[in-house]
Swiss-Prot record:
It is linked to Hyperphosphatasia with impaired intellectual development syndrome 2: An autosomal recessive form of intellectual disability characterized by facial dysmorphism, brachytelephalangy, and persistent elevated serum alkaline phosphatase (hyperphosphatasia). Some patients may have additional features, such as cardiac septal defects or seizures. InterPro entries: Alkaline_phosphatase_core_sf, Phosphodiest/P_Trfase, PIG-O_N, PIGO/GPI13. PANTHER family: GPI ETHANOLAMINE PHOSPHATE TRANSFERASE 3 (PTHR23071:SF1), PHOSPHATIDYLINOSITOL GLYCAN (PTHR23071). Glycans are attached at N268. This is GPI ethanolamine phosphate transferase 3, catalytic subunit. The gene is PIGO. It is a multi-pass membrane protein. It comes from Homo sapiens (Human). The keyword Transmembrane helix applies. Its EC number is 2.-.-.-. Changing N370S: In HPMRS2; decrease in mannose-ethanolamine phosphotransferase activity; decreased protein expression. Changing M255I: Found in patients with severe infantile epileptic encephalopathy; uncertain significance. Pathway: Glycolipid biosynthesis; glycosylphosphatidylinositol-anchor biosynthesis. It holds the Pfam family Phosphodiest. SUPFAM superfamilies: Alkaline phosphatase-like (SSF53649).
Length: 1089
């Protein structure tokens, strides 16, 4: 088997998985149909006008306008309880002084002094609670779908009808200042705009101060009809510090001053709207649908009396989209075509002096216009697509017809209006609320055919991994010829499909194209492999997973079908990992494998191999198992609680040091983080020194000696700046900002340079040649010249290695007549593992920078836990047993589980609110401008760091048992005077070959790498398959969008990251292997001169 065949086959299997994921996703996460219809004054939804028509302004279209101007102040993440007085408190929170309570005191004062002029509402937000989706809802009155949450990195212009378009069409002057997301959503729509970068969540003041610089001068100038100010400081403070930090009190107090200043400048024809687009969790995050995230504040105020009654004791709860039709009608504009919100009828009552009958009639008129608009939208939408339930739609149309008939009768018979008005209002409200509920339920559209096809393709990919992992170690299995057939058929299928679409003039669907190519390549491979190989073997051998491992894997997969277990996966994963560890220990003891590997060298013809005495007993494996369980338990201390478990308390160690208030505690934690960093660096250097690779003069080891300390120093310096940036003197802030940009980039640049050096010179050995060596001596025996074929090279390389060991070992015993040594080489036995450990360390440093400082302790535990598991695995694998090399299923499963456990221990959860957005600004404190791929890459690297590290390090599962061959060696002692006999039987005194044993059988080595990669892909693949099945079966489950859909997305992205990392890790081993061959070839040529 060739090296290229291994990588190509694994890449092909990954492509099968990618095609299955893409096909399933295209059927599961569909967006709703966006209609391009627009409302206009020339096409009213139906007749109707307010009875107080003389109060309106001339030029109104559907309804006479009530206000000529509106000031809309959006305070991002203004949670409802932020507007509460000091005596209130959050449920399940102790009634203590909270930083966010009572800071918006001007709202309560206005409500008490002018109760008919103001109202405070609890705005109910529709998830997902990300900013861009909320802005779409606040301007269109429609609902975003789940998949739209992924668009929060890159905003796109709104094509649906919206308030901003209606305002500009009516000739109103719209002035905007604040969040630059509006620039992409409404390009060219504002008469004047002041945009500020919004994505830097560490910056609390730039956007807010920029708004304040222009807000009051713009108001005083009068050159506006609608003024929009979108403040971001509260949201950024939540992301950076959380709502319970003193900085939150400062930001809310600043917003309170802004509201007071606006109230003082308002004229009688102006309405002030203060709204939060969403709330935030107790950690300051948002994006999900928890109560704290979907509960936002909405405050309305006018210098003239608007409300006929005083505010209720408990603020009314209204859907957020209700603000859209309300503002449209109050300004005399058409309601946007796709709106499904319900007007806030109280605002159409006519004020405190109006009569109850006229107030109720005005409310009914506004509601009827609103209902006509929603009915028109439902009729148009149902004609364009079949999303809406026909039965429910028919019932709603009947309800609207009855309510509309009652309303028309009401206008024609004013004498009986008082008794009928409440009924008409109730019927119209029932219709509007029913229409909204139906749309929410129906817009979860699925393509069952694509979902089934994607699931089948994922299952087939898992099946290929399982079968091929067994075939890989079978001698003579023709992987390379078999791979050419499916690749050719895949290309033929893709070309035929593209040609068919071109013939019938249909748009090319890349997802379907990839699926056709995957199926076209999969079926021929399975047919040819089974016909030529699989049918000759017993069926039981094709499913090699041991019973206990299979049982634990089934438990693992069953978790994905329960929302409760998915939520509790952070606690279930350490339990399963501990079960695998105990299974390894018990199995080693039960099978009597707690011995050293049989340190045998390749016997010469006519000799027999020898066996060494035992190296370890059961206590050794038990100590390793206890150490692993202890690391697992310690890593579990760094946990983030899901929002569904309110009794849980997240670890305070996940927050950055900058959020800590006490200076002494911050310094102590900073010292602990630096100590963990130094410990990690020292452990890697000691390990490399232990096996001698650190003494190599090659560039990678020189970099480890000098470059790694520089990277650690840069990381520690960046942590110091980040933790104290807010406390820096004003004259040093420019310097601190510059250093915060330079240091992370320098660390990343050093890491990239180290990896480049490792790829260039991956063989880290030390070669010493003696001066004046006899030219007649040669190390090539029994060959007389350099190897002429790969077979010759594979045969003589182990002999060369043994000969150099023999010469080095016996140099003190040689006499001068024997002449000096020809050559001595060190560290060949750990050449593969040294490259892998160096690469993992270089990867870990930039990934560590993307996390909070105290996560460095988790990274230290990650390396320690991996080290213990590898040693436990090495304790029971006899590397010289005749036959192919293999890694047991329980070890591969435990390795994959450790990646999942570390994902949770680094403060992540498979939900959007738990994403660490701050990672996007590590090294880019000023933001990224219009670039979106780089922040997405940084956030992705932060989220899936554990997946990447464990996938790249997966080949260590194969290499480590050979590396540990040198431990506990007990060389047989020869009696004095027995040197001649020792020279006759040198194999009895030889040092262990360690990883050079892999070069004794290169075909077995490559087959073992392929099998390991297939096993790892199978473990990851069945997880994504289980998530897809759970999402399919439970697609109408109450928690599908809250639990199952996010879990599928995170597992899918995690699989892609892990598969790429696995290919990179195996490619690095292949690169080292090729470099070792080149090194030996050059040595052979040098010996012949």
């Amino acid at each position: 088997m060739q090296k290229a065949s291994v990588l190509l086959f694994l890449a092909w299997v990954c492509f099968l998985f990618y095609a299955g994921i893409a096909l399933f996703t295209s059927g599961f996460l569909l967006t709703r149909l966006e209609l391009t219809n627009h409302s206009s004054c020339q096409e009213p939804p139906g007749p109707g006008s307010l009875p107080w028509g003389s109060q309106g302004k001339p030029g109104a279209c559907w309804m006479a306008s009530r206000f000529s101007r509106v000031v809309l102040v959006l305070i991002d993440a203004l949670r409802f309880d932020f507007a509460q007085p000091q005596h209130s408190h959050v449920p399940r929170e102790p009634p203590v002084s909270l930083p966010f309570l009572g800071k918006l005191s001007s709202l309560q004062r206005i409500l008490e002094i002018q109760p008919h002029h103001a109202r405070l509402y609890r705005s109910q937000v529709d998830p997902p609670t990300t900013t861009m989706q909320r802005l779409k809802a606040l301007t269109t009155g429609s609902l975003p779908t789940f998949i739209d949450a992924g668009s929060n990195f890159a905003s796109h212009a709104i094509v649906e009808d919206n308030l901003i378009k209606q305002l500009t069409s009516a000739g109103r002057r719209v002035v905007f200042m604040g969040d630059d997301t509006w620039k992409d959503l409404f390009p060219g729509a504002f008469s004047k705009a002041f945009f500020f970068p919004s994505f830097n969540v560490r910056d609390l003041d730039t956007v807010d101060n920029g708004i304040l610089e222009h807000l009051y001068p713009t108001m005083d100038s009068g050159e506006w009809d609608v003024l929009i100010a979108h403040f971001l400081g509260v949201d950024h403070c939540g992301h950076k510090h959380g709502p319970h930090h003193p900085e939150m009190a400062k930001k809310l107090s600043q917003m309170d001053q802004v509201i007071q200043g606006l109230v003082e400048r308002l004229e009688n024809d102006t309405l002030l709207v203060v709204a939060g687009d969403h709330g935030m969790t107790t950690n300051g995050d948002h994006g999900g649908d928890s109560e704290l995230e979907v509960s936002a504040a909405l405050f309305l105020y006018s210098p003239t009396a608007v409300f006929p009654s005083t505010p209720p004791e408990e603020p009314e709860v209204i859907p957020q989209v209700s603000l859209v039709p309300t503002l449209a009608l109050l300004l005399g504009l058409p309601i946007p075509f796709g709106n499904i919100g319900e007007v806030m009828a109280e605002l159409f009552s006519g004020g405190e002096d109006s009569q109850p009958h006229s107030s109720a009639l005005a409310q009914a008129s506004a509601l009827h216009l609103n209902a006509q608009q929603v009915s028109r939208f439902l009729h148009t939408y149902s004609a364009a697509t079949q999303d809406l339930q026909a039965k429910e739609l028919h019932q709603l149309q009947n309800l609207f017809s009855k309510a509309s008939a009652d309303y028309q009768w009401l206008l024609q018979s004013p004498k009986g209006a008082e008794a009928t008005l409440p009924t008409v209002i109730a019927e119209l409200q029932q219709f509007l609320r029913g229409a909204r509920a139906m749309c929410i339920e129906s817009w979860a559209r699925f393509s069952l055919v694509r979902m089934a096809g994607g699931t089948a393709l994922l299952a087939a990919s898992c099946f290929i991994c399982l079968l091929a992992s067994q075939w890989a170690i079978s001698p003579g299995f023709p992987f390379c010829p078999l791979l050419l057939t499916p690749v050719a058929w895949g290309l033929v299928g893709a070309i035929a499909y593209a040609g068919l679409l071109g013939t019938i003039e249909l748009k090319l669907d890349l997802v379907l194209l990839g699926a056709v190519a995957a199926v076209s390549s999969f079926l021929p491979f399975l047919w040819k492999a089974w016909a030529g190989w699989g049918s000759k073997r017993p069926l039981a051998t094709l499913f090699p997973i041991p019973g206990p491992v299979l049982l634990l894997l089934l438990f693992r997969l069953a978790v994905f079908f329960s929302d409760s277990f998915v939520v509790a996966e952070a606690r279930a994963t350490p339990f399963l990992l501990g079960s695998f560890i105990l299974l390894l220990v018990v199995q080693l003891h039960w099978e009597g494998q707690l011995l050293p590997p049989k340190l045998l060298t390749m016997p010469r013809l006519g000799t027999s191999a020898t066996t060494n005495p035992p190296r370890h007993n059961g206590a050794y494996a038990l100590r390793l198992g206890i150490g692993l369980l202890l690391c697992t338990r310690l890593a579990g201390l760094f946990h983030r609680c899901p929002e569904e478990t309110p009794v849980c308390h997240s670890s305070p160690w996940l927050s950055p040091l900058a959020s800590m208030v006490g200076g002494r505690a911050k310094n102590l934690w900073y010292g602990a983080c630096v100590a963990a960093l130094v410990a990690l660096l020292a452990a890697v250097r000691l390990w490399l020194r232990r096996y001698g690779n650190l003494k190599s003069p090659e560039p990678p080891m020189l970099f480890v000696r000098w470059g790694l300390p520089l990277m650690a120093l840069g990381t520690a310096a960046y942590w110091a700046l980040a933790s104290g940036a807010d406390e820096a003197p004003p004259r040093l802030r420019v310097l601190v900002s510059g250093a915060s940009m330079v240091l992370p980039r320098a660390v990343a640049g050093l890491a990239a340079s180290g990896l480049a050096l490792l790829l260039w010179k991956p063989v880290t050995v030390l070669v010493k040649a003696g001066a004046g060596a006899p030219r007649t001596r040669t190390v090539l025996t029994p060959f007389s010249g350099p190897p002429t074929s790969q077979a010759d090279l594979d045969y003589v390389v182990p002999q060369i290695y043994r000969h150099m060991q023999e010469e080095f070992r016996g140099r003190l015993e040689r006499t001068k007549s024997q002449g000096p040594l020809t050559v001595a080489a060190y560290q060949l036995g750990s050449v593969y593992s040294a490259a892998m450990v160096t690469a993992l360390t270089l990867l870990a440093f930039p990934l560590l920078l993307l996390h909070a400082e105290r996560i460095s302790l988790v990274f230290l535990l990650l390396f320690l836990q991996s080290f213990l598991l590898l040693h436990l695995l090495a304790a029971g694998i006899p590397v010289t047993t005749p036959g192919p090399f293999t890694v047991p299923w329980q070890a591969v499963s435990a390795w994959a589980l450790m990646a999942t456990q570390t994902f949770y221990s680094t403060g992540h959860q498979p939900v959007f609110p738990a994403i660490h957005w701050h990672a996007a600004f590590v090294g880019f404190p000023e933001g990224h401008g219009s670039c979106t791929w780089l922040p997405a890459l940084l956030v992705g690297a932060n989220t899936f760091a554990s997946h990447l590290l464990f996938a790249v390090g997966c080949p260590l599962l194969l290499l480590w048992p050979f590396l540990c061959e040198s431990q506990g060696l007990r060389k047989r002692q020869q009696p004095p005077g027995n040197e001649a006999d020792a020279r006759v039987r040198p194999e009895e005194e030889e040092e262990p070959l360690m990883e050079m044993r892999l070069r004794d059988a290169p075909q077995h080595f490559y087959a073992a790498l392929l099998q390991l990669g297939l096993k790892y892909l199978f473990i990851l693949g069945i997880q994504i398959l289980a998530c897809a099945l759970a999402a399919s079966i439970l697609r109408r489950h109450l928690m599908v969008w809250k639990v199952f859909a996010p879990k599928f997305i995170f597992e899918a992205v995690g699989f892609i990251v892990s598969s790429v990392g696995l290919l990179l890790g195996i490619a690095l081993v292949m690169r080292v292997d090729g470099a070792v061959s080149s090194w030996f070839r050059q040595l052979f040529l040098a010996q012949q001169r």
